[in-house]
């Protein structure tokens, strides 16, 4: 099979993935949606072996880079490397991503069953994103603050960040350290390889094989990808939130920008509400006949509230994040 044919098939597959949800009632997209898209990309519980494909893909890429170096590159640049570099530094750089990747895969984040109510590790409810006495509809256990149910792992993960497809594991309380070390080790190994190969290529007096250029480009690309992803992860930590909470905060701030987020000044009501203005159909004067209803920011509370004393939030600084310790280091220490 030629590379051109393989490329065409790959593009066709991507097009089917993108269009099948839109044209799921039209053949041939309907067949693809029913037999491929739905069971493989939507249903978490069907064909669970698919969850190992991305970690296998990552492992294959990494092993290909190592193979290319040892079998096609090392012999051509051997004289350009220091002895200590060949026998110690290179092996040390190659091994950590593999070892830490395995460690991140097998390290289990804590869940609600590990949580003891009233313990010193318990996070308080902020009555904005999290409310007490809310039971997970699947686990049937009261959800601690900052927890989230993972449909793939089928459990409520404490301080849940996200389910990482690269290691097929939930990132949460108990394995943040392993996850961050895995990311940093990938950046360091790829960056070192890229810079060293680039330096050798620029200063070499002889023509180097194409494999050196290929490995240099691949390591450079993976350095950028890993660095961007790691930066985005750590930027969230700086703000005192998780990936899961970032989505919640975005929703809260969208309501604020629309002038629909209010804080109650009544002692007998939860603090935060969404304001919904409804126009009466038979109103003669629209501005004077608007009906205002308030809904709690608690997604599990569907009651209508009538507030008499409240203020409309106009700036993000008026919304406290009680989980933000103030500095990046303090937030990172709290997670790990």
UniProtKB/Swiss-Prot annotation:
Tell me where on the tree of life, at the top rank, the source sits. Eukaryota
Q: Which InterPro entries match?
A: Palmitoyltrfase_DHHC, PFA4/ZDH16/20/ERF2-like
Give the CC-aspect GO terms.
actin cortical patch; actin filament bundle; endoplasmic reticulum; endoplasmic reticulum membrane; Golgi apparatus; nuclear outer membrane-endoplasmic reticulum membrane network
User: Which GO terms fall under biological process for this protein?
Assistant: cortical actin cytoskeleton organization; establishment of cell polarity; protein palmitoylation; protein targeting to membrane; regulation of exocytosis; vacuole fusion, non-autophagic
User: Which segments does the topology annotation call Cytoplasmic?
Assistant: 24-50, 108-179, 238-336
Q: Which residues lie on this side of the membrane: Lumenal?
A: 1-2, 72-86, 201-216
Q: What does it catalyze? A: L-cysteinyl-[protein] + hexadecanoyl-CoA = S-hexadecanoyl-L-cysteinyl-[protein] + CoA
Q: Where are the transmembrane segments?
A: 3-23, 51-71, 87-107, 180-200, 217-237
Q: What is its EC number?
A: 2.3.1.225
Domain DHHC, by residue range, is: 134-184
> Any idea which UniProt keywords this protein has?
Acyltransferase, Endoplasmic reticulum, Lipoprotein, Membrane, Palmitate, Transferase, Transmembrane, Transmembrane helix
**UniProt-annotated location(s):** Endoplasmic reticulum membrane
Which membrane topology describes this protein?
Multi-pass membrane protein
One MF term from GO for this chain? palmitoyltransferase activity
Q: What does this protein do?
A: Palmitoyltransferase that targets several endosomal SNAREs. Palmitoylates the SNAREs SNC1, SNC2, SYN8 and TLG1, at cysteine residues close to the cytoplasmic end of their transmembrane domain. May have a role in the cellular quality control of transmembrane domain-containing proteins.
Which family is annotated?
Answer: Belongs to the DHHC palmitoyltransferase family. SWF1 subfamily.
Query: Regarding domains, what does the record say?
Result: The DHHC domain is required for palmitoyltransferase activity.
Query: What is the protein named?
Result: Palmitoyltransferase SWF1
Protein's organism = Saccharomyces cerevisiae (strain ATCC 204508 / S288c) (Baker's yeast)
- Organism lineage string: Eukaryota, Fungi, Dikarya, Ascomycota, Saccharomycotina
